[in-house]
Amino acid sequence: DTRGAEEFAGRDVRASRGGHIPGSIHVEWVNNVDEDGRFLPASDLKELYASAYITDELGDIYTLCQTAVRATHSWYVLADLLGFDNVSVYDGSWTEWGNREDTPIDS
């Protein structure tokens, strides 16, 4: 989940329900770049994701945010800069998940 911490926790609600998908891991997309907006070196990015237990051995990885824009940024980091083979963007992202009544949510 690449959204901000308040969105992930369910305090910044941008759909009919707030929170996050159960079992999701939060790594905010802005952590991929330095203060000038440039991508961090690959070694730093690898360390960032490894510290959140996100490795290429994890299995299928789906990035999401509110509308898949920030998620695509993190997808690029994982798939292109770090070379993960198992990454996809959840296109519906939180707009879809958070507005459905039949999806589980943690906060």
Language-model features: where?
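Rhodanese-like catalytic fold shared by cysteine-dependent sulfurtransferases
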Residues: 2-107
